[in-house]
Curated annotation (Swiss-Prot):
Belongs to the TGF-beta family. Disulfide bonds join 325-391, 354-423, 358-425. The keyword Signal applies. This is Bone morphogenetic protein 7. Growth factor of the TGF-beta superfamily that plays important role in various biological processes, including embryogenesis, hematopoiesis, neurogenesis and skeletal morphogenesis. Initiates the canonical BMP signaling cascade by associating with type I receptor ACVR1 and type II receptor ACVR2A. Once all three components are bound together in a complex at the cell surface, ACVR2A phosphorylates and activates ACVR1. In turn, ACVR1 propagates signal by phosphorylating SMAD1/5/8 that travel to the nucleus and act as activators and repressors of transcription of target genes. It comes from Xenopus laevis (African clawed frog). GO terms for biological process: BMP signaling pathway; cartilage development; cell differentiation; ossification. Keywords: Chondrogenesis, Cytokine, Developmental protein, Differentiation, Disulfide bond, Glycoprotein, Growth factor, Osteogenesis, Secreted, Signal.
Amino acid sequence: MNALTVKRRLPVLLFLFHISLSSISSNTILENDFHSSFVQRRLKGHERREIQKEILTILGLQHRPRPYLPEKKKSAPLFMMDLYNAVNIEEMHAEDVSYSNKPISLNEAFSLATDQENGFLAHADTVMSFANLVDNDNELHKNSYRQKFKFDLTDIPLGDELTAAEFRIYKDYVQNNETYQVTIYQVLKKQADKDPYLFQVDSRTIWGTEKGWLTFDITATGNHWVMNPHYNLGLQLSVESMDMQNVNPRLVGLVGKNGPQDKQPFMVAFFKTSDIHLRSVRSTSNKHWNQERAKTYKEQDNLPPANITDGIMPPGKRRFLKQACKKHELFVSFRDLGWQDWIIAPEGYAAYYCDGECAFPLNSFMNATNHAIVQTLVHFINPETVPKPCCAPTQLNGISVLYFDDSANVILKKYKNMVVQACGCH
């Protein structure tokens, strides 16, 4: 989304959004700035639908997710909240601390993401967690020496490349200090009344007194499932003592289906969106909006630059709002859109917008390009021939959104160019 598109879309959305125009704090007025508040009104039905449709398009979603019985206190959502907080720390260094950057409180018993996972996160655009779908936990049977797990990867976004995948299972403390070998297998083929064909994926050594989350690398298996969904027959776990004897996973402290909600086993996968797919999505979105509003833009080009608050403030106050191009407050609330049931965080974010005059002479703080300076000068000499430059974003930052999909899986996605960091004349 280029700067001109952002400039044009914000005024349209501004009158529809449930927003507040205010100064950074109620007791602070910025130099040469005049902010006004107005009585907020409830969105009409068609306004809400238009806003929801547009934001869903920006978020890359074809429809509003309707998760079945989403639960934020389970292990997978808690882990994803921890990753979300890690991303927010980086975003807070890139922009002013705002409402959208509030960290999410976590269950104290839940371990933090490892350095390796933070490394995966730094190179990923999307992170998805998957809950275990196996209902009958084999560990409930006294003589069972294996656990089975199944994960549904059918909702992977088109065009996303899986860069890393992990299987995580919690181990409680047990009162012995024996050493065990935990092995994860990919189920290749099931057989009636026989053991399935298995392929060893990863293994690690544990001690009885060890406590915490065990992580296994299943990247190759995850890629195989994404490319060949019909081969997704799940994982199988087994435990052996050092003398090669099978051991019930429950006896070494491994938590299964009947364990606490915040210690349930799950899978997490990291994805990178290909540049080709990203350009295709942007092209389709921009084409739709250009067709819908080409006529409106043409009419607007023939009008003098209008302040974003025209129609909101009375004429007597509007004359004070004629100011130089700069950044203004704009807050988008997901809660006001009725999305609090599927968006975990943030509840909203400060998007900001650019507005103001790009009139001759352009001051240094207007972040004007050389082209804009020349265009302003020509407009000053001959206003009928060349229009004024536009006030538009010169720097945009991203945000991260944590949400449930239709299957109640938790997704953490990074979205670029969502927050105006600086404005200038272009």
